[in-house]
């Protein structure tokens, strides 16, 4: 077999296969070139999902007529010279235009801001014609026709026109979020599908642009991020855990303004939400990471979608710390989306049919619910046990450094102050699972199981950094058979598990004896618990992942040790639960990311009844 030089055209087609996989890649490369040219308005037109026609026009600085030939030649660029480690532009390789021209019909028309006329050049399957004079406004227009007509086999891998159009739209949205000061317009054969007017290039402008793309529900459910450590700055928005999605399509990350889809960053975001969201849900977040160009390598993938950080551990720590700190300082807050959904669910009922009433007055006169004093509203939750209602049950949070409701004791009678708490005063319990509370201007519905599950979980986590949880000695220690590897792995975490109140010891090869279990959990299936913990320990058998494992252990214990649905609560218990929710961090959601409560404003209730 003879080794030979490939022709320039074949080389370009091979390069195009790496850079241009589908129409969305063409649009991405052309839009990035327009942004690098300092355009403030970019218009995109496509037909048939970009397979037949793509046009990207901008009002940027333009390309001089004598440089058009270089613009469509490989490895010719104005953005870098010899320093490939200090890249400040979105594009830099000089591959996009020649790659497109080698597999499609390309026409490039451009005019600089000071030129009297424009010029155009045409590239068809790698063959260049021009440049020649043309008529156009200052800026650049790139038209691409019959994509992959040179390699028709590639067309078989294209998706439907609708799917390709959706891919282009998603890509434009991701770029537009990072550049709110640029006007973006995307249209198809017969209509404009996306119109994003320019906004201010600041945090408020970014939020306005994000609202244009994500919808009006994003802003009230988001938290502003602003953290800086050494030479790295993290800004953006992290949404409440209860405002989540079933996939990662609503996670956006930008490194020095470049949109990226990097698994490392997705993992850092999931790590930040690990103990407030279930594993099968994805948080909504938008992160902007700005750091010196020399500290990140953007030249690791042909499409520049992946990046490599010089110190990935530092970046992960910054992301996780900033998001968790922001969530911690949100206080008692849950998503507003479900409240809006509840409002939408109410429909004006049709008038009831007239019927002859058989009602007879009753002598019964119901007594209104009334709390005797503020101390009752603020009474600690001291009779809730994980295994049932017991008169002599110890306080739920006894021995743990969890803030109690005592800090909220008012000095005035409860009649005037009971509704001033963030979650108000309990008025009723319905279906033995939902607490109805009243504030000064709203109605609160609390899921007692979800709320108490979060309280127990936070108490368990708190035990890791303070005194251990109380435990109960088993009358007959239980022996659990495991594989020798699992037993050894679990025993390495013996001290950490002891803080949870779980006492284990080795009992020969491949066996563990359990002598103590957490008092908080009551009666449990010890064998099932140990085997689950062994699986968690095997999955996270590193020092870095120990905390993750312990968080999952705490979450599992909390779910089994919290108030169950169907449990009847007294008014004192309900009010004490509300006070503990207010005094405990991260109580807007349970361990699985579900909301612990929803709020319905009085104005919304009045609107439902036509009063406003």
UniProtKB/Swiss-Prot annotation:
Q: Which domain of life is it from?
A: Bacteria
Q: Which UniProt keywords apply?
A: DNA damage, DNA repair
SUPFAM superfamilies in alphabetical order: ATPase domain of HSP90 chaperone/DNA topoisomerase II/histidine kinase, DNA mismatch repair protein MutL, Ribosomal protein S5 domain 2-like
Q: Which CDD domains match?
A: HATPase_MutL-MLH-PMS-like, MutL_Trans
Read off the Pfam families from this record: DNA_mis_repair, HATPase_c_3, MutL_C
Q: Which PROSITE patterns match?
A: DNA_MISMATCH_REPAIR_1
Q: Which InterPro entries match?
A: DNA_mismatch_repair_CS, DNA_mismatch_repair_MutL, DNA_mismatch_S5_2-like, HATPase_C_sf, MutL/Mlh/PMS, MutL/Mlh/Pms-like, MutL_C, MutL_C_dimsub
| Gene Ontology biological process terms in this record | mismatch repair
Gene Ontology MF terms in the entry: ATP binding; ATP hydrolysis activity; ATP-dependent DNA damage sensor activity; mismatched DNA binding
Gene3D superfamilies xrefs: 3.30.230.10, Histidine kinase-like ATPase, C-terminal domain, MutL, C-terminal domain, dimerisation subdomain, MutL, C-terminal domain, regulatory subdomain
GO terms for CC? mismatch repair complex
> Per its UniProt record, what NCBIfam families does this chain match?
mutl (TIGR00585), PRK00095.2-4 (NF000953)
List, alphabetically, the PANTHER family matched: DNA MISMATCH REPAIR PROTEIN MLH, PMS, MUTL, DNA MISMATCH REPAIR PROTEIN MLH1
What is this protein's function per UniProt?
Answer: This protein is involved in the repair of mismatches in DNA. It is required for dam-dependent methyl-directed DNA mismatch repair. May act as a 'molecular matchmaker', a protein that promotes the formation of a stable complex between two or more DNA-binding proteins in an ATP-dependent manner without itself being part of a final effector complex.
The similarity annotation says: Belongs to the DNA mismatch repair MutL/HexB family.
Q: What is this protein called?
A: DNA mismatch repair protein MutL
Record lineage: Bacteria, Pseudomonadati, Pseudomonadota, Alphaproteobacteria, Hyphomicrobiales
